[in-house]
Curated annotation (Swiss-Prot):
Keywords: Apoptosis, Coiled coil, Cytoplasm, Cytoskeleton, Differentiation, Membrane, Microtubule, Mitochondrion, Mitochondrion outer membrane, Nucleus, Phosphoprotein, Transmembrane, Transmembrane helix. It is a single-pass membrane protein. The chain crosses the membrane at residues 13-35. Involved in cellular calcium homeostasis regulation. May participate in differentiation and apoptosis of keratinocytes. Overexpression induces apoptosis. It holds the Pfam family RMD1-3. The modification Phosphothreonine is found at residue 160. This is Regulator of microtubule dynamics protein 3. Residues 220-231 have a biased composition (Low complexity). Interacts with PTPN2. Interacts with microtubules. Interacts with VAPB. Interacts (via FFAT motif) with MOSPD2 (via MSP domain). Interacts (via phosphorylated FFAT motif) with MOSPD2, VAPA and VAPB. Its main location: mitochondrion. It is found in: Mitochondrion outer membrane; Cytoplasm; Nucleus; Cytoplasm, Cytoskeleton, Spindle. The transmembrane region is required for mitochondrial localization. Residues 168-231 are annotated as: Disordered.
Length: 470
């Protein structure tokens, strides 16, 4: 039972419980008056038989005959004898009341356990956030110079996620360390001994960066004169590089890796250009999709988001900057705590809207907006209220909103995404339009799997085939 169902059932059950209690109280009052009167007349021995069981015409069914005890006229007026059919109706209602009370008790227990679990989760999130703030404060209070360790075999600083048998929110928020974290623990073991288990270095992160940074050091002397002369090179110098990066981005997995390495090698020369920075952020997003290691995925998403932020600092009028910043927010949110995931969701929507406002003919922006609306429309009532309480902003979207965005992306570029067509089919099915859903399902089957999202949504497509089968 979902939390929303638990809340609704609890409210309905509470009303039923109050009505039942009032009825039982009235019956108890009548029973008490009858008992007192029989005591006065010296007929207390007949009271246990005032309500008795008797066999009905239905085999196997017993009903309780509500017959009046012989007495004065007042007794007969208080509890008149009921016909057998009336007694059966009363018993059926009492059975229904008892069943409802049992169901209500079960729902209350489930609601209590779910609320207890939610409270514990929120407390854990707050505690982890406070502990992380304390760690950052301690590190800022005791700055020191890092000593490089020969065991790492690299001069670059890599951010990795903590590894272990369990992966908690505390680790996802603050379990970062560098490849040389061992030397940090040796210098500050007394102050940060409790963080030692969380800071496990990852020795297999982004091996390609080592060579790229070595090349940067070799090219530093040649690029310094250009930087001192006036910053970045002109457009005629960087344009071939940008075109090559765009071509590699549209290629296969190997092409994306080469494009990332190409941009990383030229960051020292062209890193002050906005059109270079958002392409570098896009390359980080590609690498985040390609890698399978969780720590590497988080590191790529984090570094890419920083590059996108640097690009936005140079101007707010680039649709590509907003678009790839939103994409990296979504990728990084997969490795963050609940509160930060909610914040990333709002940032995602904000920057996608800006990208659409600046470049309304971009099909990717409309596809991302449709996916956001679809996910929000399927949040539970409790999840929406939690998000609204955390950020003091309403969170609402419908399946119809998602459908319009997906259709807009398909209109701008037919066959833009296989996943987009699957989402269109799912939206039509949820809106009760099965014929349209079948049509878009067939169109989705015509497209090849291009992205990992296309592969991941293949299961949904197979389920649609079964549901929409003629």
């Amino acid at each position: 039972m979902s939390r929303l169902g638990a809340l609704g059932g609890a409210r309905a059950g509470l009303g039923l419980l109050l009505g039942t209690a009032a009825g039982l109280g009235f019956l108890c009052l009548l029973y008490s008056q009858r008992w007192k009167r029989t005591q006065r007349h010296g007929r207390s021995q007949s009271l246990p038989n005032s309500l008795d069981y008797t066999q009905t015409s239905d085999p196997g069914r017993h009903v309780m005959l509500l017959r009046a005890v012989p007495g004065g006229a007042g007794d007969a007026s208080v509890l008149p004898s009921l016909p057998r059919e009336g007694q059966e109706k009363v018993l059926d209602r009492l059975d229904f009341v008892l069943t409802s009370l049992v169901a209500l008790r079960r729902e209350v227990e489930e609601l209590r356990s779910s609320l207890r679990g939610l409270a514990g989760e929120i407390v854990g999130e707050v505690r982890c956030h406070m502990e992380e703030n304390q760690r950052v404060a301690r590190r800022r209070r005791f700055p020191f110079v890092r000593e490089r360790s020969d065991s790492t075999g690299s001069s670059s600083v890599y951010f990795t996620a903590s590894s272990g048998a369990t992966f908690t929110d505390a680790e996802s928020e603050g379990g970062y360390t560098t490849a040389n974290a061992e030397s940090d623990n040796e210098r500050d073991s007394d102050k940060e001994s409790e963080d030692g288990e969380d800071e496990v270095s990852c020795e297999t992160v982004k091996m390609g960066r080592k060579d790229s940074l070595d090349l940067e050091e070799e090219a530093a002397s040649g690029a310094s004169s250009a930087l001192e002369a006036g910053g970045s090179s002109g457009l005629e110098d960087v344009l071939p590089l940008l075109q090559q990066a765009d071509e590699l981005h549209r290629g296969d997995e190997q092409g994306k890796r080469e494009g990332f390495q190409l941009l990383l090698n030229n960051k020292l020369v062209y890193g002050s250009r906005q059109d270079f920075l958002w392409r570098l952020a896009r390359a980080y997003s590609d690498m985040c999709e390609l890698t399978e290691e969780v720590s590497e995925k988080k590191s790529y998403a984090l570094d890419g988001k920083e590059e996108a932020e640097a690009a936005l600092e140079k101007g707010d009028e680039s649709a590509d900057c907003h678009l790839w910043y939103a994409v990296l927010c979504g990728q990084l949110a997969e490795h963050e705590s609940i509160q930060r995931r909610i914040q990333s969701g709002f940032s995602f929507k904000e920057h996608v809207d800006k990208a659409i406002a600046l470049q309304p003919e971009n099909p990717m922006a409309h596809f991302l907006l449709g996916r956001w609306c679809y996910q929000v429309s399927h949040l539970s009532w409790l999840e929406k209220k939690t998000a609204t309480a955390l950020l003091e902003s309403p969170l609402s979207a419908t399946v119809e909103d998602a459908l319009q965005s997906f259709l807009k992306a398909e209109e701008l570029q037919p066959g833009f995404s296989k996943a987009g067509r699957v989402y269109i089919s799912k939206c039509y099915r949820e809106l009760g339009k099965n014929s349209e859903a079948r049509w878009w399902m067939k169109l989705a089957l015509e497209l090849p799997d291009v992205t990992k999202e296309d592969l991941a949504i293949q299961k949904d497509l197979e389920e649609l085939e079964v549901i929409l089968r003629d």
